[in-house]
Amino acid sequence: MTRRQLQCYQGQDEKNMISDMKKRFLNICLFFPVLFFTHYKPVLSGVYDWKQPATTATKNINTSVMFEGNAFEMEWLQMTANILIASDKKTTVTIPANEEHLYIVKKGTLNVWKADSSYSLSQGSILVLFPGDVLPIQNTQTNACEFFVMKYRSNPFPDSERAKNAGGSIIKNWNNVEFKPHDRGGVRTFLERPTAMLKRLEMHVTTLNAGLKSHAPHTHAAKEIIVMMEGDTEMLVGKKTFKGKEGSVYFLESNILHGITNVGTTPCTYFAIQFE
């Protein structure tokens, strides 16, 4: 039987199968460039200093990237320095459906509106915004408002039900968080709870007296970010030592040895953020 005769006997199902295989192959070829361009290198443990954004008259929010990459189960993690200029107009922030954003006010006052409530968030206040959140923000003060934004995507899909059951988006005003003094300084406990992207997000603020260590060098499974609000510190990270000041951010990967010391002459204050 000739090749032409064989083709005549080929069933319709077989033809459909070959057509499907061609379509799948084409989709794979189209998908590979997406994989290439969305691949991020791991964020390296160490210190990243505040990068003052250049302000422009055409933008209310001006941003510079401090670090960006992946971090184990975090497909993408980015920390930015931001300035919101004074304006009589609100700026609407929309969180993408596959991201969460964590705001920390570094300087000034950030006005936000959520549902039927309005908030004036002073230095040290935080926002945790979930996928799909939309809210207006504004700076009505004379000076610019500076704030950190940590954006992240987890490898598993967002769990909106988990976030809803945990209480939804988070707004915490610094002035409403109790300070509990201890022999090394004191602590403010902000939160510990799951989110849409994370099984656990824990945040507290440590005030550490001059010349003291917060803890002996230690490790833990959760990744940790230290955001310096004031003072001068030194952080042991693995076998290296890094120095941080106001606006610096330490990134600590899972299970890396670390320990922070206040090397200044006055108390230092910093956020400690663990997530997994």
Segments predicted by a language model, with ranges:
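Short, conserved beta-strand element in jelly-roll/cupin
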Residues: 95-111, 205-208, 219-234
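Bacterial Sec-dependent N-terminal signal peptides
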Residues: 1, 8-13, 17-47
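Conserved short histidine dyad/triad with adjacent acidic residue
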Residues: 78-96, 204-219
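Histidine-centered metal-chelating micro-motifs
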Residues: 89-92, 96, 111, 127, ...
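Ligand-binding loop in jelly-roll beta-barrel domains
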Residues: 132-156, 254-276
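A short, N-terminal "cap"/entry segment at the start of jelly-roll beta-barrel domains
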Residues: 39-78, 86, 91-92, 142, ...
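Short acidic-glycine-tyrosine-enriched beta hairpin
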Residues: 116-131, 239-254
